């Protein structure tokens, strides 16, 4: 091993030990200085990394909640997955104690997002099973913006049993983006807990009906895009989805329907 490589490893190890020994008071002090400086990107990103490697899970979550409440989009949740199983357990306990629905939705979404990154960890499946009942219970009463988050989260932690729920939202939800994200989440299941072949078999008719009947152009484009990823096709370019190019979307719709009806 070269000297430069040894130095790099030694530096990383020292950084890890430093972060593991960070106290709440030290993190609070750094946070206060960032507030005064209006959160310059480089320092904010470094602080976020330190939060994730520190043992101060409760303080980390406190900052995330402040960010949610103030709508500042400081992205403190980006490193929460670094807390591993301990972080998941903390969020599950917090979720069980939380009574405000909007906050429960945000916690469920954060849990699902973290678990999506941890799908190869041994705690993934068991943790998903704990979050799913809460997520599903929140879906019927949630307003559109919260429902969208929950539908996206369902794609990250759902299993074969959730195909029907997503299918219902795909075909009957009154919100166009909820319908669109349902298609995306069905596709996402193939990257998580459902085998692609099984998912293709169970969703082919759903996608065909949804794409055929969809009146909202953006939702239709997003459905086609999700379906082409799942079924390995190239019906529509990303640029056409982003720019909502009517002619290309309608052409892709015809191609998708023709394939899905086979």
How does the language model describe each region?
Residues 142-185:
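Eukaryotic tandem repeat interaction scaffolds
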Residues 59-71, 104-115, 140, 180-186:
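HEAT-repeat alpha-solenoid elements in large eukaryotic scaffold proteins
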Residues 73-74, 89, 104-105, 109, ...:
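Alpha-solenoid HEAT/ARM repeat scaffold
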Residues 25-28, 45-64, 85-96, 117-139, ...:
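Amphipathic alpha-helical scaffolding segments comprising HEAT/armadillo-like alpha-solenoid repeats
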Residues 228-262:
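Eukaryotic acidic, Ser/Thr-rich intrinsically disordered low-complexity regions
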Residues 112-116, 155, 187-188, 224, ...:
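Structural signature of alpha-helical solenoid repeat scaffolds
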Residues 1-87:
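N-terminal alpha-helical scaffold/docking segments in eukaryotic complex subunits
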Residues 69-70, 100-102, 144-145, 175-177, ...:
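Alpha-helix N-cap/helix-start positions at coil->helix boundaries
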């Amino acid at each position: 091993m070269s000297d430069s490589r040894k130095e790099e490893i030694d530096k990383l190890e020292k950084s890890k030990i430093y972060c593991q020994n960070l106290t709440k008071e030290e993190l609070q002090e750094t946070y206060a200085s960032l507030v005064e400086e209006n959160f310059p990107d480089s320092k904010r990103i470094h602080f976020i990394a330190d939060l994730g490697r520190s043992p101060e899970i409760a303080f980390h979550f406190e900052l995330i909640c402040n960010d949610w409440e103030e709508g500042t989009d400081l992205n403190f949740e980006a490193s929460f997955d670094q807390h591993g199983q301990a972080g998941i357990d903390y969020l599950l306990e917090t979720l069980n104690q939380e009574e405000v629905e909007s906050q429960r939705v945000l916690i469920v979404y954060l849990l699902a997002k973290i678990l999506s990154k941890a799908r190869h960890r041994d705690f993934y499946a068991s943790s998903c099973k704990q979050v799913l009942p809460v997520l599903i219970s929140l879906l019927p009463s949630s307003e559109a913006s919260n429902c969208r988050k929950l539908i996206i989260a369902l794609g990250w932690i759902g299993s074969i049993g959730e195909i029907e729920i997503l299918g219902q939202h795909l075909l009957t939800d009154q919100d166009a983006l909820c319908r669109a994200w349902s298609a995306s989440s069905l596709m996402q299941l193939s990257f998580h807990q459902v085998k692609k072949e099984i998912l293709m078999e169970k969703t082919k008719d759903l996608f065909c009906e949804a794409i055929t009947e969809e009146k909202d152009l953006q939702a239709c484009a997003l459905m086609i895009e999700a379906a082409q990823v799942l079924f390995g096709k190239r019906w529509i370019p990303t640029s056409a989805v982003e720019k909502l190019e009517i002619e290309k979307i309608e052409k892709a719709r015809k191609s998708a329907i023709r394939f899905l009806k086979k």
